[in-house]
Amino acid sequence: MKVVVIGAGLIGTSIALGVKRAGAEVELIDLDGRAEKLANDLVSNGKVSDPDLVVIATPTSSVHRVIEEFKDIYPKSTFIDIGSTKTKVKVDVQTFGDFSKRFVPTHPMAGREVDGAEGAQSDLFQGKTWVVTPLEESAPESLKLVSELIESLGARVKVMEVAEHDQVVALVSHLPQIISSLLAAQLDTRNSEELSLAGSGVLDTTRIAGSNPDLWREILNLNKEALLPLLKNFQKDLSTLIDNFDVERVLNEGRKGRQSLPGKHRSASRNYQYLPVVLEDKPNQLAALFD
């Protein structure tokens, strides 16, 4: 398989690393020349002509522009996007007429709170769910090619309707981002002495608050319609807790909800690289290695 990835950020570079590891030819393209060079150096690849697949790994607001620029450069290629919301993508793609036959909207349910190619991992999608929301026009051969790409990255294909996808990710992805950010914002008013007591509880619940604000502002605004009812329900639950302080009920319901999630073994184990190190047989050699 030959793949071109447009967008040399975390997801785009991780896709490139993964397909390269799976034996595909891959090229990364980015408007930022420095980012493009860094990503291509990491992946160690060259130019790709006549790709089977073009992955648009840019913010959703850029998808229309990228299609306009590249659909005729790669006239036979299947295109996919990897954005967190699908309604706008569907509307944008269908303005291009017959092109929509070779476009498949997708969304890998994977990521990290770090930005850019520097945080990319070849196994980022291993064992994760990768949602596909086919258009009515999406050609069967395009869908087959997309499934092959996803499976080569170790992910599981899940087919959904566009509207259903946007409703579900509002709950399992977008609402947690807002709640984590609100909690983390409380920490900004505290002094370092107080914050030195922070343990795994606050670190775990605020981890995603470290994500790129510009990227998430766009995602949340694009899915505002699905997100607002969830925020209102959350506000209602908080008001009830404040009025009644029924913490036992809240804790029990929270525990039950947590237990309804797939188990900790839902993700496959990662393949790590090992570097043999030879040390002299004398004191403090291991400590010196990490100094």
Each model region followed by its residue ranges:
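Internal alpha-helical scaffold of NAD(P)-dependent oxidoreductase catalytic cores
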Residues: L124-I208
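Interdomain hinge/lid region at the active-site interface
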Residues: N191-R255
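NAD(P)+-binding Rossmann beta1-loop-alpha1 motif at the extreme N-terminus of oxidoreductases
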Residues: M1-K47
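Short beta->alpha hinge that forms the Motif I/post-I loop of the SAM-binding pocket
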Residues: L31, T58, I82-S84
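Rossmann-like NAD(P)(H) cofactor-binding subdomain of soluble oxidoreductases
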Residues: V66-A117
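N-terminal Rossmann-like NAD(P) cofactor-binding module of classical short-chain dehydrogenase/reductase
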Residues: V54-V55, I80
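A conserved regulatory-domain signal marking ACT and ACT-like small-molecule sensing domains
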Residues: S260-D291
